[in-house]
């Protein structure tokens, strides 16, 4: 970076040679004045108001205008004879906490660079001293023909100089305050706090000059002969007189904007995931319905076993036997009936529930009746044995 001023930092008895370079740059758009008739650029010439003659740069000097309008010529030799100790020196006058500096005083910013190898050690000493003390240095320096006030602080590994306005150059704020005694309610303060929390923080590096970019795009479009569509006016939502309503609308708009930004970041994933989720739910729902139908069919089969013509007592004992004796054929038939019924129900969704129940009932009845017959036959054998034993006893 090109230096704009060379001098030294006066730090007590220590003198640190430095170079002053601009820390900022101006990116604003500047327009030229042209003649509308032919597009020619308009130039300004220096003309003496007394003889109305054009004056060149070599014939131009400077003067101090007195209160009554009198011009008092001042030459460069006159200025060079002034006792100005800060002409080539940044003179540190005090070290103060950073919060002692009013941001209203902040002006242009510069970087201070050590000028030469011998300046590196004292430069580093001052930088580290400012870091450890958490203070800033207040200094005076002369630049572009006037003495200025400045503040030295550490930025990374560099000492920066901020130009400051003199205290008498800051206007008092009382004239800008609202007139009258205005009361703010707690509800309004709460909504304002909510709005500030909703807006959140911002990455300063992401901020840019939208107007400058729009002007550059406009100039490029006109240079290529393209037409630029007019910008659509923003919807401000109309005039809101009620402060509470305005705050509520602001909070709502901030939340909507934040939600839209969050949804825009992963909208593609949401579009891919949703159909799969619905398909999975439908599949699980279908299987659940099939299982429910199979369970209802099995219950129907169990209820039907109570209506067999064998009798109430036999039917209950047969039903009990079929449930308890897993190795018997009737239990196996019931398991097969349950599985086949579940498979048929899952494969054929349009089959009526009553038809499935009838088929299962028939199979369940057959198995239960067979078990009942076996129980009845075994019961008959037991009765015969009891009769023969009675005959022997009577004999």
UniProtKB/Swiss-Prot annotation:
InterPro entries reported for this sequence: Ku70/Ku80_beta-barrel_dom, Prok_Ku, SPOC-like_C_dom_sf
Domain of life where this protein originates: Bacteria
Polar residues compositional bias, start-end: 283-292, 311-320
GO molecular function, one term: double-stranded DNA binding
Low complexity: compositionally biased ranges: 362-371
UniProt GO BP: DNA recombination; double-strand break repair via nonhomologous end joining
Disordered, as annotated region: 252-395
Compositional bias per record (Basic residues), positions renumbered to this chain: 351-361
Ku domain mapped to chain residues: 9-181
Gene3D superfamilies: 2.40.290.10
UniProt keyword terms in alphabetical order: DNA damage, DNA recombination, DNA repair, DNA-binding
CDD domains (UniProt xref): KU_like (cd00789)
Subunit field text: Homodimer. Interacts with LigD.
Similarity comment text for this entry: Belongs to the prokaryotic Ku family.
Function: With LigD forms a non-homologous end joining (NHEJ) DNA repair enzyme, which repairs dsDNA breaks with reduced fidelity. Binds linear dsDNA with 5'- and 3'- overhangs but not closed circular dsDNA nor ssDNA. Recruits and stimulates the ligase activity of LigD.
Protein name in UniProt: Non-homologous end joining protein Ku
Organism of origin: Streptomyces griseus subsp. griseus (strain JCM 4626 / CBS 651.72 / NBRC 13350 / KCC S-0626 / ISP 5235)
């Amino acid at each position: 970076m090109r230096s704009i001023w060379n001098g030294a930092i006066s730090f007590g008895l220590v003198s640190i040679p430095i170079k002053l370079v601009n820390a900022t740059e101006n990116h604003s758009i500047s327009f030229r004045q042209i003649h509308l008739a032919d597009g020619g650029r308009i130039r300004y010439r220096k003309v003496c108001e007394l003889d109305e003659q054009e004056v060149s740069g070599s014939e131009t000097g400077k003067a101090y205008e007195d209160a009554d309008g009198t011009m008092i010529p001042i030459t460069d030799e006159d200025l060079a004879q002034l006792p100005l100790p800060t002409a080539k020196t940044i003179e540190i006058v005090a070290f103060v906490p950073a919060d002692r500096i009013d941001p209203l005083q902040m002006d242009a910013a510069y970087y201070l660079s050590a000028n030469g190898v011998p300046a590196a050690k004292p430069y580093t000493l001052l930088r580290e001293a400012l870091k450890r003390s958490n203070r800033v240095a207040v200094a005076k320096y002369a630049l572009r023909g006037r003495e200025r006030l400045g503040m030295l602080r550490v930025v990374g590994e560099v000492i920066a100089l901020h130009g400051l306005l003199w205290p008498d150059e800051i206007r008092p704020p009382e004239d800008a305050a609202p007139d009258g005694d205005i009361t703010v309610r707690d509800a309004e303060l709460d909504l304002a706090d909510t709005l500030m929390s909703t807006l959140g923080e911002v990455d300063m590096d992401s901020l840019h000059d939208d107007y400058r970019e729009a002007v550059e795009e406009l100039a490029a479009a006109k240079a290529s002969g393209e037409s630029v569509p007019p910008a659509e006016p923003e919807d401000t939502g109309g005039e809101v007189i009620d402060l509470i309503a305005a705050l509520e609308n602001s909070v709502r708009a901030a939340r909507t904007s934040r939600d839209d930004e969050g949804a825009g970041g992963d909208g593609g994933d949401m579009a891919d995931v949703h159909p799969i989720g619905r398909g999975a739910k439908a599949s699980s729902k279908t299987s659940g319905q099939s299982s429910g139908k199979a369970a209802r069919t099995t219950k129907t089969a169990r209820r039907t076993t109570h209506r067999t013509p064998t009798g109430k007592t036999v039917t209950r004992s047969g039903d009990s036997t079929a449930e308890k004796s897993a190795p018997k054929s009737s239990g196996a038939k019931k398991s097969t009936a349950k599985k086949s019924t579940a498979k048929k129900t899952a494969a054929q969704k349009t089959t009526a529930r009553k038809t499935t129940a009838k088929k299962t009932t028939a199979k369940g009845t057959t198995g239960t009746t067979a078990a009942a017959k076996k129980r009845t036959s075994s019961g008959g054998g037991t009765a015969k044995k009891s009769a023969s034993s009675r005959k022997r006893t009577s004999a």
